[in-house]
Amino acid sequence: MNVLSLFDGMGCGAIALRELGINVDKYYASEIDKFAIMQTKHNFPGIIHLGSVLDVDVSKLDRIDLLIGGSPCQRFSFAGKRTGMTTTENEEIYTLDRYLQLKSEGFQFEGQSYLFWEYMRILTDIRKYNPNVKFLLENVEMGDKWERVLSEAIDLILSST
């Protein structure tokens, strides 16, 4: 099984898979925190580090069987502002297509919660090569509006095959 872990942190996905006894052929990790990467390299020297989620190109990877990750959640969280995914111009982003359009036009985004759309972009791309890819998206309890947005985005991906 080939795994792609987005927002990998210190390799908790690799730890969980190991503890479950799941054999992993290749484990790709996208993470930008240098201390988390150092710890992961120490614990799992075989992990292939890809850098920022913004730079992940699945066409350059072996077929991915499992995508895991939890995008930053500060702007969804009850402990945060709960303002969700917005541009610096305060436009709320409700679809992957709109996110990709804004990104291509050079818009800037508030906080890091918009990176959910990068998870969805990558999942969409993986499904071109492996429509049966399994995925796990972990996130926080959030307000109803943003929970609907995330759920609808996932449903659209699943129903597009």
Name the predicted role of every residue range.
Residues 1-161:
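Conserved active-site and SAM-binding loop architecture
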